[in-house]
Amino acid sequence: MLSPQRTAAVASRGAGDAMENGKPGPVQVVLVHKEQHSFELEERALASVLLQDHIRDLDVVVVSVAGAFRKGKSFILDFMLRYLYSQKEGGHSDWLGDPEEPLTGFSWRGGSDPETTGIQIWSEVFTVKKPCGKKVAVVLMDTQGAFDSQSTVKDCATIFALSTMTSSVQIYNLSQNIQEDDLQQLQLFTEYGRLAMDEIFQKPFQTLMFLIRDWSFPYEYNYGLQGGMAFLDKRLHVKEHQHEEIQNVRNHIHSCFSDVTCFLLPHPGLQVATSPNFDGKLKDIASEFKEQLQALIPYVLNPSKLMEKEINGSKVTCRGLLEYFKAYIKIYQGEDLPHPKSMLQATAEANNLAAAASAKDIYYNNMEEICGGEKPYLSPDILEEKHLEFKQLALDHFKKIKKMGGKDFSFRYQQELEEEIKELYENFCKHNGSKNVFSTFRTPAVLFTGIAALYIASGFTGFIGLEVVAQLFNCMVGLLLIALLTWGYIRYSGQYRELGGAIDSGAAYVLEQASSHIGNSTQAAVRDAVVGRPPADKKSQ
C-alpha cells in the first residue's frame, strides 16, 4: 500500500503526464509529507501552469475551495470546470451537461477517507473576457480536507492559510450549518491576516463565501444566495450581551475579509450519499441541488463577477502569483507556525520580487531589440548609452509599482535588480563583441604577429652572431606555431575548450600589455576596432 507521500507524488506525476499528453488535469503544487508534518512546493509543476506564454502576464483570478475533509469540495469544483469549459465553447444555458455523463476533473469519490492531499490546481488556466473587455486568467484550486485522522492543527491551518493568502475567492465548504467551532477554526486559520492588517492598514484577504451543504431548514432560510445572506447576517451579528470571545470571533472575520457572503445548498440526494457506485451523473442528483448549482456556479464564475487577486491594493499576475507561492511556502517549512509578522514579511518579499522581475523584463526586452539575436554588431559606446537608458527605464518602473515593506525594505531589492541588470549588460557586451569580426581573429592575429616578430628577431640575432639567442627565438617561434595550430583545431572540433580559453586569455594579456605602452588615442582605437570590448562603466569610474 502506498504511503500518503508516495500517493501524492504519484498523483503529481500523473498530472504532469496528462499535461504532456495535452490533456488537462489536476496538478499537485503543494505536497504534504504527513509523517513529518511538513510541506513542499512543487515549483516546477506550478511554473508549468502559471508561466504559459498566453497567460503569464494576465491578472489572475484564483477560486479556492477549503474546509473539512469528505464534504464534497472537489465535487463542487468539477461543476465549476463544466461551467468554464462551457463558457470557453461559447456559453449556453445547459452547461450542466448530459444527464448520463459522469463527473470528471478533480479527483473525488464517495466514502469516509480523504481524497485530496495538499493543494492542487487545474492545469488549464482559463482566459475570460470581462464585460469591460479586459482579459483575466482564472485558476481553480482544490485543497486538502481539514481535520482528517493524519493532520495536525498546524497542517490544517497551513493549508487553509496558504489557499486563502493566494486566492481571490475562498469558498469555505461547511456541512449543514455554521457552527461556532467552524468560526473559531476560521479565526485560527486567518489570524495571520488580522495581525498583519494592523501594520498595512487594510483587510489582507478578499472574498470569503460560506458554502453550506445539505441545508435542512429551507422553511427558515431559502436555498441560494438570498437565504444564505439572511442566515449569515444572523449568525455573524454582534450583540451586546454576547460573550467577548464570541464577539471577537465575528469582528475578526469582518476585519480579515473585504467581502463575506453565504450560499445555502440542499442535499444532493440519497443516491449521491449512499451509493458506492455513484459517478457524478446528473440523473442521480436531486433536482433541487441541480437547480441551486445553476445559481451558485455562475454567481462565482460569471465574467461580470470575477475578482482579480490583489495584494496591498495591486493586482497580481500569474507570474506574480508564482513568486507569492514561493515566498509563502518558505515561512511554513519550519517546525512552528510562523509569527504573523512573517506573513507580512513574505508578502512584502514576494511583492518586491515580482516588481523586480517585471522591471528586469523591461530592460532585457529593450536590449534584445537593439543587440540581441541576429542583430548586427553595435558600437560599444552606443551599447553603453542604450544600457544606461534602459537601466533607468527599468528602475523607474520598479519604483513606480506599489510595494509593501516601505522604501528601506525595497531598496535591497532595487540593489539586487541593479546587480542583475549589470550581469545582463555584461552578457550583452560579450554577445555583441562576438559579432565583431576583428574580435574573432584577435587570438590568431596576436599569435601570428608574435611568430613574425620572433622570426625576424631570430634572423637578426643570427646575422650578428648571437646564435644562442637566435636558437631561443626559434624555439619560441615553434611554441607559438604549435599554439596557433592547437587553437585552430580547438575552434574547429570544439574539444579541449579549457585549453582554448587559456590561449585566448594569454593572447588577450599580451595585447593588453602591448596596448598599455601606446598613447591614449591609439589605445582606444585598438580596443574598439580590434578587441571589440565595451568601454568601462562610467558609473564605476
From Swiss-Prot:
It is a multi-pass membrane protein. The modification N6-acetyllysine is found at residue 391. Pfam families: GBP, GBP_C. Residues 1-445, 489-541 are cytoplasmic. The chain crosses the membrane at residues 446-466, 468-488. GO terms for biological process: cellular response to type II interferon; endoplasmic reticulum membrane fusion; endoplasmic reticulum tubular network membrane organization. Residues 1-25 are annotated as: N-terminal hypervariable region (HVR). Signal peptide: none annotated. Mg(2+) binds at residue 142. Keywords: Acetylation, Endoplasmic reticulum, GTP-binding, Hydrolase, Magnesium, Membrane, Metal-binding, Nucleotide-binding, Transmembrane, Transmembrane helix. Residues 57-305 form the GB1/RHD3-type G domain. It comes from the Eukaryota. One of its GO terms (molecular function) is GTP binding. It catalyses: GTP + H2O = GDP + phosphate + H(+). The GB1/RHD3-type G domain mediates GTP-binding and hydrolysis as well as homodimerization. Belongs to the TRAFAC class dynamin-like GTPase superfamily. GB1/RHD3 GTPase family. GB1 subfamily. Atlastin-3 (ATL3) is a membrane-anchored GTPase that mediates the GTP-dependent fusion of endoplasmic reticulum (ER) membranes, maintaining the continuous ER network. It facilitates the formation of three-way junctions where ER tubules intersect. Two atlastin-3 on neighboring ER tubules bind GTP and form loose homodimers through the GB1/RHD3-type G domains and 3HB regions. Upon GTP hydrolysis, the 3HB regions tighten, pulling the membranes together to drive their fusion. After fusion, the homodimer disassembles upon release of inorganic phosphate (Pi). This is Atlastin-3. It comes from Mus musculus (Mouse). The lineage of its organism: Eukaryota, Metazoa, Chordata, Craniata, Vertebrata.
